Amino acid sequence: MRFIHALLLAGIAHSAYASEKLTFKTDLEKLEREKAAQIGVAIVDPQGEIVAGHRMAQRFAMCSTFKFPLAALVFERIDSGTERGDRKLSYGPDMIVEWSPATERFLASGHMTVLEAAQAAVQLSDNGATNLLLREIGGPAAMTQYFRKIGDSVSRLDRKEPEMGDNTPGDLRDTTTPIAMARTVAKVLYGGALTSTSTHTIERWLIGNQTGDATLRAGFPKDWVVGEKTGTCANGGRNDIGFFKAQERDYAVAVYTTAPKLSAVERDELVASVGQVITQLILSTDK
């Protein structure tokens, strides 16, 4: 009798979980219709196992979300001894491109350290600092090689900033899929890709990101620990990737959206709405 009772409870739990995942899907489809948007979402656990998703295998432009794995590559080089965080990277005015606040601030000195550039790329989405790091690691091809090294066979970087943000429909360059990027996040933060010191630093940077207050974290409960890296590009691209801790469980998440008919503020609100849909799913399945 106890065995039958346990089976009944398991069946009820499975049915409830399936119902919540269906609600998750229908809520995202409703957002897509209302906003004339395409929304890609992947949520995985620390092992990279799928929790939920929508358009998980569809390619989207990475936009600036690649700056998080770029920073991870920089930390890997530091961990292995092939790079030093305090090494000064010299540059001139030619490194100043659109949206380079930290690069402009350090221009008078003629250099930034490796860690200063990496932090600016993650927390400010500084394009000049990003290109400076790409110069040092060997260009976009080296970034793609790192993706492959950590098990991501999908994500690719082909150009530097700002060209990589063109987001031309049908162009495979500089793209990823939600599931590929979510698993890359999980690999970096939970899979031992970096030393504990480097992992802690990059987590702290993501939590202190200055470009994402209106996106995913705006849709998550205030008591969740959230760290993320946003991305914005042409033709309505607005993205957010990172991690969150909810009810003592860790998750990696990737959200990619294309909404060319919306304003910049409305695109932020769209990503925040996706965060609310994710919240509903997590709270209902973690009971």
Swiss-Prot record:
Coiled coil: none annotated. Residues 1-18 form the signal peptide. Keywords: Antibiotic resistance, Disulfide bond, Hydrolase, Plasmid, Signal. The keyword Cell membrane does not apply. It comes from the Bacteria. GO terms for molecular function: beta-lactamase activity. GO terms for biological process: beta-lactam antibiotic catabolic process; response to antibiotic. Belongs to the class-A beta-lactamase family. Monomer. May form dimers. Extended-spectrum beta-lactamase (ESBL) which confers resistance to penicillins, as well as first, second, third and fourth-generation cephalosporins. Has ceftazidime-hydrolyzing activity. Inactive against the carbapenems, imipenem, meropenem, ertapenem and doripenem. However, weak hydrolytic activity with respect to imipenem has also been reported. The class A beta-lactamase family has a specific amino-acid numbering system, sometimes called Ambler or ABL numbering and often misspelt as Amber. A multiple sequence alignment was used to derive a consensus sequence and then the consensus was numbered taking into account insertions and deletions. This allows use of identical numbers, e.g. for active site residues, despite differences in protein length. UniProt always uses natural numbering of residues, hence there appear to be differences in numbering between this entry and some papers. This is Beta-lactamase GES-1. It comes from Klebsiella pneumoniae. The gene is ges-1.
